[in-house]
């Protein structure tokens, strides 16, 4: 590096800071040189081509950093393909089978150091070739897979998850202060690039209602006040049309959404069944009849288990069990403390509903998209306010976030349970450790033949020794969502 260049780099820096800056530049330069050498090697190029061909042939859906990078215009891409080996994350509705199949393909192509292993997250399998992580294959139910595929973008023959799904994954991560916050800066940078190039919706939202209207308007005001009070008293977190209307106060008058007294509530509750039961009891106290509670199962891992409260044909409440620890802010209204989900939390949930393939979401797709766009606009217009409901990256959260230690303990307990039960299929699903080379080289004992004077020759076959694929520890798996 020339002296003149050193002076420019070190302008306004102390001697020690300048020395460290020069060191970092040297490290970056050396890393780039080694990266180019690795990426351009024939073996690595072959490895990349094989996994890309596999994804194309099976029409699997890529997600994560590689997906975001691939759908951005070249000037906004953050990966340098000349120095970085792409790590493909993709969805499959038959992930275990696909992981083993991909490992077999590499082995047949002449690679001997090949293995497919379970990740830390159940349902995710990692494929390694020559000790390089080349693929993370994550299971999702076929219904979600098909919903994603419908809106996926194809680039050079590879399917990439829809922008709104990729956006949802990043909002989800930014809404979990008890998660891996060391990733937040990287995630936000990528989210800004995605938002710059892809809008949430092009639907005309001027005539879209943000609250569910009730078909039966009789006792509408009583129902609204009763449900609202019951939910506030339970300390749940609001995130539906009720919460959306509260955020509208931060928009210009002509863009504000009026909060109508429709019983239209969506909340997070640590015990959604109890929340629904209490709401039903309070409604009965007010003489309301024809109330029923419907349990709705989780949709993969994008929409949690929830309970719907209906009065006749009208849905007045959806209470969801948290799938992590979701950030919220506190609003004091009429002397009451209301917990309102942050915009990041609300967007992560709304955008997930788009791919749940449930009738009660599908009939309100435009509403969900427009509510999401409205919240996005609120956030953009008030990005640096950091007060009241607008405080972003709140460190208070609702729900439980599993730690790495808890996940490891769960897997250890599961391994013990499955070993005792002898359920080999489920054991493999949880603890896959598949090495094609070991299967090929498993020794077989000689087959001996015994003769008896009075009997015909009879063969006795000794079965092949089965290798236990679960002896090794699993490599730590990175987060599947992003």
Q: Model-found features: residue ranges?
A:
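Active-site and adjacent loop segments of nucleotide-processing enzymes
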Residues: 135-214, 315-450
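Short, conserved charged micro-motifs
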Residues: 96-103, 273-280
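N-terminal regions immediately upstream of nucleotidyltransferase
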Residues: 1-46, 154-222, 441-458, 462-470, ...
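Residue-level detection of beta-strand-connecting loop/turn positions
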Residues: 9-12, 131, 313-315, 335
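Active-site nucleotide-donor binding segment shared across nucleotidyl transfer reactions
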Residues: 44-96, 222-273
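Conserved catalytic core of two-metal-ion nucleotidyltransferases
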Residues: 104-146, 282-328
């Amino acid at each position: 590096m020339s002296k003149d260049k050193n002076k420019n780099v070190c302008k306004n820096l102390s001697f020690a800071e300048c020395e460290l800056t020069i060191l970092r530049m040297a490290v970056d330069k050396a890393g780039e040189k080694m990266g180019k050498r690795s990426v351009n090697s024939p073996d690595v190029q072959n490895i990349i081509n094989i996994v890309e061909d596999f994804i194309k042939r099976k029409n699997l859906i890529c997600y994560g950093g590689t997906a975001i990078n691939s759908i951005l215009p070249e000037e906004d891409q953050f990966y340098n393909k000349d120095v970085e080996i792409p790590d493909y994350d993709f969805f499959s509705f038959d992930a275990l089978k696909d992981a083993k199949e991909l490992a077999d393909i590499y082995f047949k192509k002449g690679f001997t150091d090949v293995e497919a292993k379970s990740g830390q997250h159940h349902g995710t399998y990692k494929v390694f070739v020559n000790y390089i992580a080349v693929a993370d294959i994550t299971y999702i139910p076929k219904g979600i897979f098909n919903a994603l595929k419908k809106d996926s973008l194809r680039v050079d023959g590879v399917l990439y998850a829809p922008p709104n799904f990729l956006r949802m994954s990043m909002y989800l991560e930014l809404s979990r202060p008890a998660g891996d916050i060391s990733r937040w800066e990287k995630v936000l940078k990528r989210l800004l690039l995605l938002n710059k190039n892809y809008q949430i919706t092009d639907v005309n939202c001027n005539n879209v209602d943000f609250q569910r209207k009730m078909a039966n308007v009789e006792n509408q005001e009583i129902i609204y006040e009763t449900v609202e009070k019951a939910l506030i008293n339970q300390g749940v977190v609001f995130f539906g049309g009720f919460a959306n209307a509260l955020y509208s106060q931060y928009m210009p008058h002509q863009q504000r959404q009026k909060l109508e007294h429709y019983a239209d509530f969506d909340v997070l509750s640590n015990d959604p069944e109890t929340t629904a039961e209490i709401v039903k009891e309070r409604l009965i106290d007010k003489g309301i009849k024809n109330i029923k509670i419907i349990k709705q199962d989780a949709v993969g891992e994008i929409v949690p288990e929830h309970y719907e409260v209906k009065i006749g044909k009208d849905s007045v409440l959806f209470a969801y069990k948290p799938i992590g620890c979701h950030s919220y802010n506190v609003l004091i209204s009429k002397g009451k403390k209301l917990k309102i989900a942050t915009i990041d939390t609300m967007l992560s949930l709304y955008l997930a509903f788009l791919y749940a393939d449930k009738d009660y979401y599908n009939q309100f797709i435009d509403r969900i998209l427009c509510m999401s766009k409205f919240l996005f606009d609120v956030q953009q217009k008030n990005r640096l306010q950091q007060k009241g409901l607008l405080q972003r990256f709140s460190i208070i959260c609702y729900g439980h976030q599993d730690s790495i230690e808890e996940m490891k303990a769960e897997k250890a307990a599961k391994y013990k349970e499955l070993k005792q039960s002898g359920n080999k299929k489920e054991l493999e699903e949880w603890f896959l450790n598949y090495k094609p080379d070991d299967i090929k080289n498993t020794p077989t004992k000689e087959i001996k033949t015994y003769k008896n004077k009075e009997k015909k020759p009879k063969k006795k076959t000794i079965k092949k020794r089965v290798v236990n694929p679960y002896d090794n520890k699993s490599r730590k798996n990175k987060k599947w969502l992003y």
